[in-house]
């Protein structure tokens, strides 16, 4: 009966965090709107080989992540849940691997369940795992690869070892097809310290070639297909998306070496109090093969991405699978022997919740700020934000009431965040970051437009997805579409600021022309260097400007 109760609790936990509240959150631009529109266009066109965004070639990522996203929208429709269904599925599959791997290492069902709950409730896992980007997919393939390698190295027969390495190659191949060649580098770096300390080089060299073969065979069909359709894809993807993005002086998302320290700290909530003890206990028990493997899995990717010039929090998502297992193992030891770390964890969550409550008041309409985040008419959103932090502090306090038994309720600290964050976003944020909100407010004006132009790729993708049309024209700025716009068949999909007046005269009689611009909050629309418009509708950071036929 206890096992049944645990399973019911786990399913309720997943429903409250990963299923029920997802539709209440509008899509964020630029990331979610971009991937939503790429997958919508894939379904609409039936082209499952070459990715397109706004009808233009889009070579920033390979294809596999878009396949999964497209299946999500095909199954659940073009809605918020359908867009995020793929990443949620990948996150839950990763959690299932955490369960399986923990059971494999320690043969303890309670520990396996705890590791799963810790993983799913980690702030960084939840934030990224319910956000429609490709990182949950690559995290799943990396975690699957690490599990496959362990399975192969623990097998006692040549058939078992061969199967494990073949599976490793498939996971690496799918990782390459999801986000590129980092799916090869990260697993290799992660296992090398373990291979060295356990002196398992022989197995690696004897069977490793099977992983190489299965990886190549996994990528080859699509790799050849896109090379035939778009011969310059691999050159662009390898040089621009890998070398320039991570290594060169002009790398994207440049950040200092220590960048991931605060990411690890914030990402470990609501289990931050377990982080030092989990790592220390893991290091102290480094003579144990499994512990070394988990430590290497956690630390090596962190070091690799810290050295790289380009950094984003999402890059280290796969590290938190192994970290969750280390935390769960340490938590049970602490509960049994010395619950000090569990008490500290409770106080950290209380402090975080109280700090959030105070910060919410400071930026609320009743706080001391001259320009509050929320306006007076958004009072219910302020109370939603207060509820988020109040629940966080409450469950932090509850874990202290009988710490040896109640410490695991820290998993419920983010419950308010999961259920209420979609209702607490300020209008001033929604107007700039949620194109769906803008479309809803201006639907009647946008729908009959013959041409729609915008100066933001994220807004363009949001407009395209919401209006179910991929002919949005870029105005003044090309952004990440620069490469696709260079193709001859993309002529007419970009209008510069200097050309706009002439372009308007040439196309005005064809129908309503709508210009959607991103502006500063205090920017005077009348100062924009554009021809006089027939209608203007400003929604804070986004403004709709229309020209009708004359």
From Swiss-Prot:
Signal peptide: none annotated. It catalyses: 4-amino-4-deoxy-alpha-L-arabinopyranosyl di-trans,octa-cis-undecaprenyl phosphate + lipid IVA = lipid IIA + di-trans,octa-cis-undecaprenyl phosphate. Keywords: Cell inner membrane, Cell membrane, Glycosyltransferase, Lipid A biosynthesis, Lipid biosynthesis, Lipid metabolism, Lipopolysaccharide biosynthesis, Membrane, Transferase, Transmembrane, Transmembrane helix. It is found in: Cell inner membrane. Its EC number is 2.4.2.43. The chain crosses the membrane at residues 7-27, 81-101, 111-133, 137-154, 165-185, 204-224, 255-275, 288-308, 315-335, 346-366, 382-402, 406-426. Pathway: Lipopolysaccharide metabolism; 4-amino-4-deoxy-beta-L-arabinose-lipid A biosynthesis. GO terms for biological process: lipid A biosynthetic process; lipopolysaccharide biosynthetic process; protein O-linked glycosylation; response to iron(III) ion. InterPro entries: ArnT_tfrase (IPR022839), Glyco_trans_39/83 (IPR003342), LipidA_mod_glycosyltrf_83 (IPR050297). It is a multi-pass membrane protein. GO terms for cellular component: plasma membrane. It comes from the Bacteria. Its main location: membrane. One of its GO terms (molecular function) is 4-amino-4-deoxy-L-arabinose transferase activity. Catalyzes the transfer of the L-Ara4N moiety of the glycolipid undecaprenyl phosphate-alpha-L-Ara4N to lipid A. The modified arabinose is attached to lipid A and is required for resistance to polymyxin and cationic antimicrobial peptides. Belongs to the glycosyltransferase 83 family. This is Undecaprenyl phosphate-alpha-4-amino-4-deoxy-L-arabinose arabinosyl transferase. The gene is arnT.
């Amino acid at each position: 009966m206890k096992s049944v109760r645990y399973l019911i609790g786990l399913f309720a936990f997943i429903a409250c965090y990963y299923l029920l509240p997802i539709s209440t959150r509008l899509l964020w631009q630029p990331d979610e709107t971009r991937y939503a529109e790429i997958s919508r266009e894939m379904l609409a066109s039936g082209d499952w080989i070459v990715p397109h965004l706004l009808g233009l070639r889009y070579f920033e990522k390979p294809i596999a992540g878009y396949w999964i996203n497209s299946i999500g929208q095909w199954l659940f429709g073009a809605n918020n849940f359908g867009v995020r269904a793929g990443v949620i599925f990948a996150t839950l599959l990763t959690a299932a691997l955490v369960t399986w791997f923990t059971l494999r290492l320690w043969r303890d069902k309670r520990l396996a369940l705890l590791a799963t709950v810790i993983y799913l409730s980690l702030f960084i896992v939840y934030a990224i795992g319910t956000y429609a980007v490709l990182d949950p997919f690559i995290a799943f393939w990396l975690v699957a690869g690490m599990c496959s390698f362990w399975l192969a190295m623990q097998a006692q027969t040549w058939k078992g070892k061969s199967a494990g390495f073949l599976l490793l190659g498939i996971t690496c191949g799918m990782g390459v097809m999801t986000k590129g060649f980092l799916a090869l580098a990260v697993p290799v770096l992660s296992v090398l310290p373990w291979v060295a300390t356990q002196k398992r080089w022989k197995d690696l060299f004897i069977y490793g070639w099977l992983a190489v073969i299965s990886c190549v065979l996994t990528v080859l069909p699509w790799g050849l297909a896109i090379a035939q359709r778009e011969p310059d894809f691999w050159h662009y993807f390898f040089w621009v998306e890998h070398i320039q993005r991570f290594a060169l002086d002009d790398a994207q998302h440049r950040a200092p070496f220590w960048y991931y320290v605060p990411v690890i700290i914030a990402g470990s909530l609501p289990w931050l109090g377990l982080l030092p003890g989990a790592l220390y206990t893991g290091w102290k028990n480094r003579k144990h093969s499994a512990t070394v493997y988990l430590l290497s899995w956690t630390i090596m990717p962190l070091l690799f991405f810290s050295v790289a010039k380009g950094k984003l929090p999402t890059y280290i998502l796969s590290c938190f699978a192994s970290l969750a297992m280390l935390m769960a193992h340490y938590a049970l030891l602490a509960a049994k022997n010395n619950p000090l770390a569990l008490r500290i964890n409770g106080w950290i969550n209380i402090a975080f919740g109280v700090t959030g409550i105070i910060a919410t008041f400071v930026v609320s309409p009743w706080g001391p700020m001259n320009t509050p985040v929320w306006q007076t008419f958004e009072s219910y959103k302020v109370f939603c934000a207060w509820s988020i932090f109040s629940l966080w502090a409450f469950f932090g306090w509850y874990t202290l009431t009988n710490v040896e038994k109640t410490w695991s309720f820290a998993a419920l600290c983010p419950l308010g965040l999961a259920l209420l964050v979609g209702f607490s976003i300020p209008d001033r944020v929604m107007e700039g970051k949620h194109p769906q909100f803008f479309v809803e407010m201006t639907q009647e004006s946008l729908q009959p437009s013959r041409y729609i132009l915008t100066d933001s790729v994220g807004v363009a993708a949001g407009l395209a997805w919401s209006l179910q049309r991929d002919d949005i024209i870029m105005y003044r700025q090309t952004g990440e579409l620069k490469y696709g716009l260079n193709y001859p068949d993309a002529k007419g999909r970009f209008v510069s600021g200097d050309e706009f007046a002439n372009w308007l005269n040439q196309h005005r009689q064809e129908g309503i022309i709508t210009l959607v611009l991103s502006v500063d909050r205090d920017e005077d629309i009348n100062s924009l260097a554009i021809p006089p418009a027939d209608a203007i509708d400003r929604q804070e950071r986004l403004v709709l400007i229309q020209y009708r036929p004359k």
